[in-house]
Amino acid sequence: ILHIGVVNFRGDLIDKKLDVPFKNANTKESLDALAGIIQKFIKTLSINSEKILNININISGRVNPASGYSYSIFNFEERPLAEVLREKLGYNVTIENDTRAMTYGEYLQGNVHGEKNIIFVNVSWGLGIGIIVDGRIYTGKSGFAGEFGHVVSYDNEVLCHCGKKGCLETEASGSALIRKLMEREANGEISLLSSRIREKNALTLKDVIAATEKDDVMCIDLIEDIGNNLGKHIAG
């Protein structure tokens, strides 16, 4: 899914559209679909489209905002993704790692407003960290700072989507949570989500969190396990 918003120079949210259906894939068709969704959203805005000065695309994985290259998704062209999208959309386009963008948003207007040094942990389907040092977002030499989830931390033989085995993300992320839930259910444990698993319905993190709010013992135990794994590595 996609979330799209428009903000002004003060950081005020002018308009938004949340939970837009989108199938994320490393294909030209998926990229064209992304551009189409953005163009459709722009047409619905009450403001003059000429006032749009920049479109910033936040995506997961390895992103170098300075060069405009994405190395994890939409990386099939031998030129910057920002340049490709600029041609498709007709606006200036920049790209940024999604976790770093969240970090900066929290820094400007969120719970850490006013702090100078921040570590922001984003646990979603994957796992990432955003870093602010002396009030400035830290990207690292190559623009990849914060790829915490791909530190090899376990001898578990679980293949990560990055191609390596044993990444922290394989034991402490949303995808790890869903995988472990399905494994334990297959071994005979019961959850409020068991029927959905057997029917092969896709599960989301929201489903698991909703189950914990209904005192689902297995989901509570899994979230505690994920939290312990994550906490140990952040502290270490």
Language model features by range: what are they?
Residues 8, 65, 132:
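Short, acidic, Ser/Thr-enriched surface-loop or helix-capping motifs
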Residues 14-117:
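Glycine-rich phosphate-binding loop and adjoining helix at the ATP-binding site
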Residues 97-99, 143, 225:
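Short beta->alpha linker loops
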Residues 2, 62-64, 128:
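Short, acidic Gly/Pro/Ser/Thr-rich loop/turn segments
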Residues 1-51, 89, 155-159, 164-236:
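ATP-binding/phosphotransfer module of carbohydrate and carboxylate kinases, centering on a glycine-rich
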Residues 114-172:
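Glycine-rich phosphate-binding loop of actin/hexokinase-like ATP-binding domains
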